Regions:
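S-adenosyl-L-methionine
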Residues: 145-161
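Core catalytic lobe of class I
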Residues: 1-143
Length: 161
């Protein structure tokens, strides 16, 4: 389990319900949990040479310092703006990027069964992974398609100078 620390303190936000009263205090969520699960033991410990020989992805993209930081069970990452993204519950692309780099190789395929605004697809593309996304809400399908297309355009456009 990874604890995503979204904010430190209340940052001026107020949890209405019974402000400054014991009648009905509402807790303000400053963290969320990311559950890491696998069927059986999570083990992709085939040697690089065996993976390469069998045509399987084998290249890591994670920096050693990032690996050490990201294998801690708390990640402090600022939340994403719902208004800016256009989705009521967006998360920053940094969250799936870290998970993708920790648990997959370059060239692997990432599955996102709840695509929402497309953050995981964008993170997968930026880290050299393939992705498959699913979303039931047609509005979010259109949003994700637009955001992925914009990310592809930015990804393919060389920086000036």
């Amino acid at each position: 389990e990874i604890v995503w620390i979204k904010a430190e303190g209340a940052s001026g936000n107020c949890a209405w319900g019974s402000y400054a009263s014991a009648a009905n205090p509402v807790l303000r969520d400053l963290t969320e949990r990311i559950v890491i699960a696998s069927k059986g033991r999570f083990d992709r410990a085939q040697k690089r040479s065996v993976r390469e020989k069998n045509g399987l992805p084998f290249e890591n993209s994670i920096d050693p310092d990032d690996f050490m930081a990201w294998t801690l069970d708390t990640w402090k990452i600022a939340p994403e703006s719902a208004k800016r993204v256009g989705h009521p519950a967006p998360f920053p692309a940094e969250l799936p990027r870290r998970c993708i780099e920790l648990f997959t190789y370059v060239g692997d395929t990432v599955l996102d069964p709840f695509m929402g605004a497309g953050q995981t697809a964008i993170a997968a593309m930026r880290t050299g992974r393939h992705y498959v996304g699913m979303e039931l809400d047609p509005e979010y399908v259109a949003l994700a398609e637009r955001r992925v297309e914009e990310a592809l355009h930015l990804f393919r456009t060389p920086e000036p100078g």
